Amino acid sequence: MLDVSVIVPARNAAPLLEECLAAIVRAEPRELIVVDGLSSDDTVAVARRHGARVLSDDGRGVAAARLLGVRAAACERVALVDADVVMGDGALAALLDEFAAGGYTGLQAGLHSIGGPGYWGRALAHHHRSGRSRRWFGLVATVFERSVLLEHGLDERFLSGEDIELRRRLARNGARLGVSERTVVLHRFEDGFAFARGQWLADGGGLARTLDKEGWRGAGLLALPALAAARGIALSVARREMRFLAYYACYLVFNYAGMVRRRT
């Protein structure tokens, strides 16, 4: 049995959660916690069927859900795993071993992103596989010492982007953060324009909130969506993948729309 508490935030995630939790259960962690965000589907039933301890964040969002799970966890190490992640056999144990051997403050698994059969799901996955963000530390499938998250916390006002704010805050405090190249997990994107648009708006809002907190230190974040879109467009043209141009145009527009919405 692995001495770790696995925390999975989930809201209306029943179709994804089944495979996610089955993989976690096979890894035999000491504790599995699912934090439900007032789901209207079978999320809670799926969690209980896999033996998870189920908590509710009362719909306060993913940052609040993660922190609630950390506070309730019994183990000294916690693994934050999103419902859209599937960990292969041995992946959790390997990530824990690398975390301990490398002296990390936080270590995220590498992500192999896949999307649904439609345009927007495939485009989201393509962006995350080819973009620089795949090497950025985040909270998608990540191991921490519980005490670190209790000390530094997560800003519960964030709907998205709290991982960027936490990463920058921990880095300023000398934390050792990393993304594993040895342990890679499956990261699944839902399909449809509505899902993609919601992601972009929430991400833009998260960047704006980080800017509000950091002031001049966060000024570089203003250029982040533009730089990512420009890189994606340039690569699409160079590789003759012109079908992705519409994706990057929408990514650019709705990220900045999310930033403006947050600041008005």
Locate predicted features.
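Non-catalytic, C-terminal membrane-associated alpha-helical segments of glycosyltransferases
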Residues: A194, G198-T264
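Short aromatic/hydrophobic "clamp" motif used to bind/position activated sugar donors
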Residues: V78
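Acidic donor-binding loop at a coil-to-helix junction in glycosyltransferase catalytic cores
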Residues: S160-R168
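A conserved acidic beta->alpha catalytic loop
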Residues: A23, D36-V44, V85
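Conserved donor NDP-sugar-binding/catalytic core segment of glycosyltransferases
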Residues: V86-Y119
